[in-house]
C-alpha cells in the first residue's frame, strides 16, 4: 500500500488565453477545470486542450498552483 503521500492528486486547469485577456479586461471570466493526475506518471505540470466557454473555442488549459 502507499505510504505517506497519495499517488493521485487533484489539480486545477486554467485557460491560458483567458488569463492573458483578463489583463486587458476583454474576457468575461477565466475557464477552470478540476481533474486528477498521477504523480508517478506525470511529475511535470499538466497541460490539456479543453473547451473554454469564454473564448468559445478549444484552448490549452495548464495546471495552476493551489
Swiss-Prot record:
Keywords assigned by UniProt, alphabetized: Chloroplast, Plastid, Ribonucleoprotein, Ribosomal protein
Compartments where found: Plastid, Chloroplast
GO biological process: translation
Entries under InterPro entries matching the protein: Ribosomal_bL33, Ribosomal_bL33_CS, Ribosomal_bL33_sf, Ribosomal_zn-bd
Record Pfam families: Ribosomal_L33
The UniProt record lists the keyword Ribonucleoprotein: yes
Domain of life: Eukaryota
GO MF annotations, alphabetized: structural constituent of ribosome
UniProt keyword Plastid, yes or no: yes
Entry GO CC: chloroplast; ribonucleoprotein complex; ribosome
Family, as annotated: Belongs to the bacterial ribosomal protein bL33 family.
UniProt xrefs under NCBIfam families: PRK00504.1 (NF001764), PRK00595.1 (NF001860), rpmG_bact (TIGR01023)
HAMAP family: Ribosomal_bL33
Name of the protein in question: Large ribosomal subunit protein bL33c
Organism of derivation: Cicer arietinum (Chickpea)
Amino acid at each position: 500500500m502507499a505510504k505517506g503521500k497519495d499517488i493521485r492528486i487533484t489539480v486545477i486547469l486554467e485557460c491560458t488565453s483567458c488569463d492573458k485577456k483578463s489583463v486587458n479586461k476583454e474576457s468575461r471570466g477565466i475557464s477552470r477545470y478540476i481533474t486528477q493526475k498521477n504523480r508517478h506518471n506525470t511529475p511535470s505540470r499538466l497541460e490539456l486542450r479543453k473547451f473554454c466557454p469564454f473564448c468559445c473555442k478549444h484552448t490549452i488549459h495548464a495546471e495552476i498552483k493551489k
